[in-house]
């Protein structure tokens, strides 16, 4: 049986964290790099060094956080890599730009739904 430390994504300090990519998912505190499922206030926080989201979510984030944030955007289904992990956003239908986030690494597949 795996320990929590051995999972690709784990619960850490009240948030979801992918240590291999050094990335937090919908963090509740400022972090270096944050993947955002959608722009509701309970799914992002102010002060992250970099945000990663869909283009539509980025528009809403900038309205709420300010235009001076560093944000990378991706289309639904567009894969990008961080430290060998394939990551992509997929529609969730919750609000404009909301997404599920898929992680693929080696034989593991993870899907984070947000809400």
Predicted regions and their residues:
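Conserved G/P- and acidic residue-centered "switch" motifs that form tight phosphate/ATP-binding loops
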Residues: 38
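His/Asp/Glu-rich metal-coordinating catalytic cores
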Residues: 3-10, 15-18, 24-28, 33, ...
